[in-house]
Amino acid sequence: MESAQDNQGRILLVDDESAILRTFRYCLEDEGYSVATANSAAQAETLLQRQVFDLCFLDLRLGEDNGLDVLAQMRIQAPWMRVVIVTAHSAIDTAVDAIQAGAADYLVKPCSPDQLRLATAKQLEVRQLSARLEALEGEIRKPKDGLDSHSPAMMAVLETARQVAITDANILILGESGTGKGELARAIHGWSKRARKACVTINCPSLNAELMESELFGHTRGAFTGASESTLGRVSQADGGTLFLDEIGDFPLTLQPKLLRFIQDKEYERVGDPVTRRADVRILAATNLNLEEMVRESRFREDLLYRLNVITLHLPPLRERSEDILILADRFLARFVKEYSRPARGFSDEARTALLNYRWPGNIRELRNVVERASIICPQERVEISHLGMGEQPAGSAPRVGAALSLDELERAHIGAVLAASDTLDQAAKTLGIDASTLYRKRKQYNL
């Protein structure tokens, strides 16, 4: 089957009047379009089997053939093709029926060359926009970093995720920091029937209860100090789509009843506004915390947990996905050498062995950071162990069996692991329980 041209649309004309076909063809070919003609439904069907068309002008009166039946067959045979109905004044009602059946527009005979050219340009522009949208949706559905896996454990998780994505069930994603929980959430949205709507993310640890309520549900002007203008809130932004609650274990306990009510009833009020609103939102949540333990300690509501974990997905850590380590490393390297215009083209055997032997406490995020650094500092085609910044005993890896480590060595390993698993220095300092200035001194001390 031939491919449609990229720059000039391929057009099919279907009419049982040869004079109409000839006039339309000359007009469109003068504009540079590639045009094929058919004087019957059978001829049109044959052409559609052999070629790809972007646009069809279809006469509703095709001798003994019913134009609506031909349209229905075209929608099956070439669903991407735009179809414009050509009709007489007396059949406008039928043309309206055709639009309801899937036609893009209609022209009334006799039509001028300008009308034909305008209709063609309009429909081909829509076709190009549709093709771009399909390409973007294809990108959304492509496996992201860490989701294109050869690990049986990870493949099982992804299979379940694809199966439940088409439902509206709430999903709780569990896994260590850096395992790709956010990427999986966005992939689930992309695989779902809500993919054309927004996927809105809230990072729960970043907001206190008051700010979280405003961020989630919105507020009116003057609702609190500093509220100089009204905001819609993330729930409203996600209407028809997906709301992803990242690190749900840090969601303020005092606000959990309002979140529970929204999940149950799809109803909420903006801060400072008594009007009850509704939003159709699918909830995805993720955490690296043990929510069941938090429930036992009265730090998380049990009823909210039950609402969130209709489906639970457990992402395995990278150390349990050894099949994926080198694949991911190669992919990251290819990306970063292109981004930074660096010479590296692969890893030495020693570097590959080191990558496989490392425990990756920071998981995929840490691997990405290590490879990015290596791609920048490596001056040659092969990345060596020295470029990885790992050495024989990488910071944060498990202690060597039988080796006695000093307190300084243990501290260096621990700080290195936390740094690798953190997006920012402030986040790492918070995890370590020290201030940023202390962390800065420790990094200098241990050359991290």
Curated annotation (Swiss-Prot):
Q: Extract the DNA-binding region annotation as residue ranges.
A: 425-444
- Which InterPro entries does the record match to this protein? AAA+_ATPase, CheY-like_superfamily, Homeodomain-like_sf, HTH_Fis, P-loop_NTPase, Sig_transdc_resp-reg_receiver, Sigma_54_int, Sigma_54_int_dom_ATP-bd_1
Query: Would the keyword Transcription regulation be found if you checked this record's keyword annotation?
Result: yes
Residues where 4-aspartylphosphate is found: D59
Gene Ontology MF, one: ATP hydrolysis activity
Q: Which CDD domains match?
A: AAA
Its name, as the record gives it, is: Alginate biosynthesis transcriptional regulatory protein AlgB
Domain Sigma-54 factor interaction: where?
147-376
Boundaries of every Response regulatory domain copy = 10-124
Provide a GO biological process annotation.
regulation of DNA-templated transcription
Extract the PROSITE patterns matched here.
RESPONSE_REGULATORY, SIGMA54_INTERACT_1, SIGMA54_INTERACT_2, SIGMA54_INTERACT_3, SIGMA54_INTERACT_4
| Residues annotated for ATP binding in this entry | 175-182, 238-247
The metabolic or biological pathway listed in the UniProt record of this protein is: Glycan biosynthesis; alginate biosynthesis [regulation]
Superkingdom is Bacteria
Q: Give the protein's function.
A: Positive regulator of the alginate biosynthetic gene algD.
| Gene that produces this protein | algB
| Alphabetical list of Pfam families matching this protein | HTH_8, Response_reg, Sigma54_activat
Sorted UniProt keywords: Activator, Alginate biosynthesis, ATP-binding, DNA-binding, Nucleotide-binding, Phosphoprotein, Transcription, Transcription regulation, Two-component regulatory system
